Amino acid sequence: MTISVQTNASAIIALQNLNKTATDLQGAQSIISTGLLINTAKDNASVWSIAQGQRANVGALSAVQASLNRASSIADVAQTAGASISDLLNQVKQKVVAAQDPSLDTTSRAAYNTDFQSLLRQISDVVNNASFDGANILNGSLAGNISFLANADASSFITLSAQNMSLGSSIITIGSTASILTLTASATVLAEVNASIINVNSALGDMGAQATEIQNHTTFVAKLSDVLNQGIGNLVDADMAKESAQLQALQAQQQLGVQALSIANSAPQIVLQLFK
């Protein structure tokens, strides 16, 4: 081997190797700290681009899940209120049927009418308070359906139908001023009560079916989001056991490289020894 005081080829090579090891070590440390094999576009442009696209879809699905969760809450509140209304209508029917007794005196009939009016007010209170986040599908404030996001590109929607259960509506046909003070009036109201009970129970069935549809779709969206996250992980996640082993190997190489550079740098000293 030629020894020169002008050019130390061995030291240059050792330094190059040490620099490469340092670069590789920095990369390994970055992978371990982030847990990502592909963290930026420079790591692998095509894979990074695909992963970013899927991350965008996952983010959009989070918005879909939020919309569907709101739909479920609105439906749950409406169903709870609807069940209470159904129970109140059963009590209303009891009072109206009792008022059909021709033997009742005026005082007794008035007492039944007072109870009847109280129950109607309770129905109105339930209807008016069946709101979630400003949405009430029972009080007639919504003319049709409420639409909620169903997919990541906002091109598909799932709907929750308004069910107007206000007094005097097409579902509860009993008017707010209805009275059972007379036999004739109570007979008219009884027909309205019977129709209202049927209508409310039918509306509750529709709401239940829609709530189930919303819940099923919410479950699907959550699973889809999980699958996409797993797919992203398959693309960019690092094998931590492998990377840990690689880090240890690079650390050993770095130590050896430092020693090699030290040895190479000491070679020119041999020239000085020749002149002693």
Each model region followed by its residue ranges:
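Primary detection of the long, small/polar-rich alpha-helical "axial" segments characteristic
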Residues: 1-276
